[in-house]
Swiss-Prot record:
Biased composition (Pro residues): 65-81
Designated name of the protein: Probable protein VP2
Entry keyword annotation includes Phosphoprotein: yes
UniProt lineage: Viruses, Viruses incertae sedis, Anelloviridae, Alphatorquevirus
Biased composition (Basic residues): 227-251
Ranges for region Disordered: 46-167, 200-280
Compositionally biased region (Gly residues): 90-100
Originating species: Torque teno virus (isolate Human/China/CT23F/2001) (TTV)
Length: 280
């Protein structure tokens, strides 16, 4: 920063310095002899880098005495510098008006034709800048749509707003990831279904591929094949053990007339069935 002259005169600055040191001593020590205190400690601090001062003893705070001149007062400002050149005064009185006209005449005499051309060119540039619409700074918050034209211009042009999200975390990216995941799952399921269908078709033969039999179908009437096979089977001879068991059964059955009748009826039915088979 450039140096500036002080705003107060030398006597005023000296008074402020004395008042500041007096009040600082009163706040620190509290004794009445400000000058004597300074004279007593001045010899100890003559050499630079002396020993550190001892720690101050704990004392009870005393009320600060009043200064010689009371509270510090602001000194009057310095008088303006004396010189021949003084700025012209604006308005108020004939002298001011005369000074203003004189200043305008000096300013007009200072500008040449080249300077006037530059001034006119600068003024024309200012007019052009004021008439042309400046580009609005990028907005970080949504702005309302005033008309259809503004909506179209905003949607067709690239957005200047700064994106505060990281890549892959906005709603569109998350939705795209979910859709891609579901599509992959569906593709895997369809692939499994196709494999299952192909394996089922390979395991079950096609009935159209079976060879056709050239023999004519035969109509079965009367006895079935099972009856013919029964006819051909010969009865095995009964062993001695089976004969004894049959005799015992017959002896037991002869005791009851009802059982005898039942056995006779069953034997009659068997004989009739056998006769029918042999007749056929």
């Amino acid at each position: 920063m450039p140096w500036r002259p002080p705003a107060h005169s030398v006597p005023g600055r000296e008074g402020q310095f004395y008042a500041a040191t007096f009040h600082a001593h009163a706040a620190f020590c509290g004794c009445g002899g400000f000058i004597e205190h300074l004279n007593s400690i001045h010899p100890r601090f003559l050499g630079a880098g002396g020993p550190p001062p001892p720690p101050p003893a704990l004392r009870r705070a005393l009320p600060a005495p009043e200064g010689p001149g009371g509270p510090p007062q602001h000194a009057p400002p310095n008088p303006p510098p004396e010189g021949d050149h003084q700025p012209p005064r604006r308005g108020g009185g004939a002298g001011g008006a005369g000074d203003g006209h004189a200043g305008d005449g000096d300013a007009a005499e200072e500008y040449g034709p080249e300077d006037l051309d530059l001034l006119f060119a600068a003024a024309a540039e200012d007019d052009m800048l004021s008439t042309t619409r400046a580009r609005s700074p990028p907005t970080r918050y949504p702005s309302p749509v005033r008309s259809l034209e503004s909506y179209k211009s905003v949607t067709r042009q690239g957005s200047d707003r700064k994106q505060f999200f990281t890549s892959g975390t906005k709603d569109v990216d998350c939705l795209q990831k979910e859709v891609l995941k579901e599509c992959r799952n569906t593709h895997q399921m369809m692939k499994i279904f196709r494999q299952v269908l192909q394996s089922a078709q390979l395991s079950t033969p096609d009935p159209r591929a079976w060879p056709e039999s050239k023999e004519a179908p035969t109509l079965f009437s009367g006895l079935s094949k099972t009856a013919k096979t029964r006819r051909r089977v010969k009865k095995k001879p009964l062993s001695s053990k089976n004969k004894h068991t049959k005799k015992k059964k017959r002896s037991y059955s002869s005791s009851s007339p009802s059982s005898k009748d039942n056995t006779s009826e069953s034997s009659n039915e068997d004989s009739e069935s056998c006769s029918e088979t042999y007749s056929n």
